[in-house]
From Swiss-Prot:
Molecular function GO labels: structural constituent of ribosome
GO biological process: translation
Lineage: Bacteria, Pseudomonadati, Campylobacterota, Epsilonproteobacteria, Campylobacterales
TM region positions: none
Protein name: Large ribosomal subunit protein bL32
Gene name of this polypeptide: rpmF
UniProt similarity note: Belongs to the bacterial ribosomal protein bL32 family.
UniProt xrefs under NCBIfam families: rpmF_bact (TIGR01031)
InterPro entries: Ribosomal_bL32, Ribosomal_zn-bd
């Protein structure tokens, strides 16, 4: 089993964690002009 040779500093650990981000959902404009999530069925226009 791998064991770290030395302690990882708070700064170094934080720099590594900067890439763990949550991507924001990108809504798309529907035919009726409202913004919806992609790949979801729209109950008003009955479209996917």
């Amino acid at each position: 089993m791998a064991v770290p040779k030395r302690r990882v500093s708070k700064t170094r650990a934080a720099k590594r964690r900067t890439h763990y981000k949550v991507s924001l959902p990108m809504p798309v404009k529907d035919k009726d002009g409202s913004y919806k999530m992609p790949h979801r069925a729209n109950p008003t226009t009955k479209e996917y």
